[in-house]
Amino acid sequence: MAKKVVAVIKLALQAGKANPAPPVGPALGQHGVNIMAFCKEYNARTQDKAGYVIPVEISVFEDRSFTFITKTPPASVLITKAAGIQKGSGESAKGSVGSINRSQLEEIAKTKLPDLNCTSVESAMRVIEGTARNMGVAISD
């Protein structure tokens, strides 16, 4: 019989830099999970993606064991890196703070495709394009 899941914890952590300090410690500690074991495993899995924020979904079982799935970085993080800006515009309707070209947009869409509710790269590109527009990042051809 399969183990019963008692909790699902969602966190967004810097790749390769998980440590027992908040937010990791309190989130896992209240469910009795071995925090250091999670940190070591997460850091090992994400060390090649340094500099990105990697969302993680942790399933905690009733015997206090756990499994976790890492997701792709948020679209906003990928867009800001591609555009070379610190953050998106607070007033995206008034003007753009940066721009990315179609090839960069396609690269981001291919990266995000497994986590998006899309089947083709073209539809994923439209989703990412909308995110970029809302951030005040222009798309150039």
From Swiss-Prot:
Q: Which UniProt keywords apply?
A: Methylation, Ribonucleoprotein, Ribosomal protein, RNA-binding, rRNA-binding
What Gene3D superfamilies does this protein map onto? Ribosomal protein L11, C-terminal domain (1.10.10.250), Ribosomal protein L11/L12, N-terminal domain (3.30.1550.10)
A single Gene Ontology CC annotation of this entry is: cytosolic large ribosomal subunit
Task: Give the superkingdom in one word.
Answer: Bacteria
Question: PTM details?
Answer: One or more lysine residues are methylated.
Q: Name one GO molecular function term.
A: large ribosomal subunit rRNA binding
Q: Name one Pfam family in it.
A: Ribosomal_L11_N
* GO biological-process terms attached to the record: translation
Q: Which InterPro entries match?
A: Ribosomal_uL11, Ribosomal_uL11_bac-typ, Ribosomal_uL11_C, Ribosomal_uL11_C_sf, Ribosomal_uL11_CS, Ribosomal_uL11_N, Ribosomal_uL11_N_sf
The protein's role, per its UniProt record: Forms part of the ribosomal stalk which helps the ribosome interact with GTP-bound translation factors.
Subunit annotation = Part of the ribosomal stalk of the 50S ribosomal subunit. Interacts with L10 and the large rRNA to form the base of the stalk. L10 forms an elongated spine to which L12 dimers bind in a sequential fashion forming a multimeric L10(L12)X complex.
Q: Which family does it belong to?
A: Belongs to the universal ribosomal protein uL11 family.
Q: Can you say what this protein is called?
A: Large ribosomal subunit protein uL11
Give the classification, highest ranks.
Bacteria, Bacillati, Cyanobacteriota, Cyanophyceae, Synechococcales
Question: What's the name of its gene?
Answer: rplK
